[in-house]
Amino acid sequence: MDVFIHYTQLPEGKTLADVVGELNEVLDDTGVVCGGEENRLDLDLEDETVNPKFAQLAVKTYLQQAGFPMDTTLEIGGMEIGIYL
């Protein structure tokens, strides 16, 4: 399952490499950051082995705790969802 993180800026004091590394730690064996483009990170969640909702919740929690801006969204199945909703 593909999930996209749309953001306008990174949290203060974090580089893109920091965020990618931390997300890969959060996802552990349930997914991986697999690319992206300007202001977007692409994640591949392993829906065959684990309920993808757990990984989605872990990503959302990480983004909140890392201090991503209020307008950051997760795109899942073509729908964008705010991380603070």
What are these regions (language model features)?
Residues 1-13:
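Short glycine-/aliphatic-rich beta-strand segments at the starts of folded cytosolic domains
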Residues 42-45, 81-85:
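Short, solvent-exposed polar/charged micro-motifs at secondary-structure junctions
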